[in-house]
Amino acid sequence: MRFFARMKRISLIALIAVLVSCSTNADRPAPPAAVTPDADAVRAAVQHTFDGLATHDSTMLAAVILPDANFQRWGADSTGTWRTVNLRGGAFTSRLGQPGPAYLERTWEADVRVDGDVAVFSAPYDFWVEQTCSHCGYDAITLVRSGAVESDFRGWRIASLTYTVDASGEDACRERFAGMPASPFPAE
């Protein structure tokens, strides 16, 4: 009996210690996104991807996207059921590097974490097609340093990109993401 009473007491003390440490950490603001040459290069690699999308330039896209990168799109279908679509980096590059409508992808409030030769870029985004907000969501991009370090993005290349898609329209996107920038296109 004494053994169980002692174990209860130890468990209670451990639980209190965990709760105190959690509540103490909850009061602290999250650390700011890193501002280092590598973090800036990661941001440059992501922006390079968006610039390649905007110009439908498969060479630009291939410079920053690994051929075997995994792209995963999460969004609701017409019935409201969440579905995923998977695509390899080479297929993404060749598909979106073809002539087509004008694209613009923007992110804001990006968080960049770098650990050696691996980095994570995460941020809300909006995606515009022909001056209309097509959808918005959240980008989670993993990059690895595997290219030429002399490049504008210091060798950082995209290894995976997982993103959510909310195609409910611009108003719904603005409601969902309070920090969404104003439309990049003049009102008609």
Model-found features: residue ranges?
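Short, low-complexity N-terminal intrinsically disordered segments enriched in polar/charged residues
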Residues: 22-67, 176-181, 185-188
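Bacterial N-terminal signal peptides that target proteins for export
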Residues: 2-12
